[in-house]
């Protein structure tokens, strides 16, 4: 018998991370199932980043803090709100643990025009999709003290 990939039952092996299917959605109203998209694989997880002031942005692709206007997929601070890069899409999640599939469905059905800190209190997650639509960041506001710094926690996913 040929050896099966993964564990003995063909499933993932211990320590492996299975891909997350962007299209694994329940049927929509009317009984249709949304189209299935390529799976999103975990990139980096639980990265906590602090931008000292508005001269810095969060590089969502690399998971680091960079000087403003130096990367194409970013999250910037604009007063008391976040400002995603141009051509990025955002969605403020209802639950506490959205998946990439939840983010895609939310972005495509209820995109967020603004991301004010007040709406994101208590680490309420929000999603930002890259301009090329191949990456998703699930972001939580950790702190936004009056001194101008902002701290976030980010999980990033990318398509195969």
Name the predicted role of every residue range.
Residues 96-160:
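Extracytosolic low-complexity repeat regions of secreted or lipid-anchored proteins
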